[in-house]
Amino acid sequence: MPECLPFRYMWRSFWKMLNKSVMNFIGCDAGYEEADIVLYGAPFDSTTSFRPGTRFAGQAVRNDSYGLETYSPYQDRDLEDCRIFDLGDLELAIGDSELVLSEIEKTAETILKDKKLPFMIGGEHLVTLGAVRAAARQYPELHIIHLDAHTDLREDYLGVKLSHAAVIRRCWDILGDGRIHQFGIRSGEKSEFDWARSGHTDFHPFTLDDLPGILPELKGKPVYFTVDLDVLDPSVFPGTGTPEPGGVVFFTLMKNVTEVCASLDIIGCDVNELCPPCDHSGMSTAVACKIIREMLLALKK
């Protein structure tokens, strides 16, 4: 008959658990002042064009992150050794896109001014625009690396310019030609593909194969990194509002995002378009959690 653990050990373990906030992403327990990275959620999906529910992603990944270890054997790094503050989800006015973007912009601007890296969990992809507005104001030479299944380059979607289907076009309005680098794209209108291929963006459709090749030219430049998780194949990641067959597998995405985060001067980033209600198995949320963990660890310089 095995011996029971002494009560003092059981109490020590219980007390440690009580002092961990399960409202945080696992391992993101630093205070704001000491943090190098600030994680925050943007629960917004009002312009979703197909299946809604991305506004639930922030809390889903926080809850399910406790199924992960803080340690990554891929990088031999541990979140326990990082200084990351989890701000929680922002309170956003769901029906007003401009008000939402303004709130995200103010949050990102504050974090950047405090010399910290803002890491946002969407939400639909439109939320990226708020963070990019703040980043471009502080870093006029900003570049964007954009991983996605969709071009997101429409001038408008059904007359709406502030749409997740037009978010990268709105970012282009700020940055102009040559500073947006797109990878994995496999869906969009012909006019979007033609517009991108005419030189407005650095366009690499279908795969991430060309991504390592652009890293040397971006060395030393400020980069905002936006990852729409529907870049993954739906067999790996079905829990998204607009699934698109023909995407990359998990290990390919993980390898590339960690290389980008470790190699470049990433001044802000986001992971978006997880839609937990679209995958009741929880598989997609688990994938999102692991991608976020690997990005956070790779950002630790």
Describe the residue ranges of each PLM region.
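Conserved alpha-helical scaffold segments that buttress catalytic/binding sites
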Residues: K16-K301
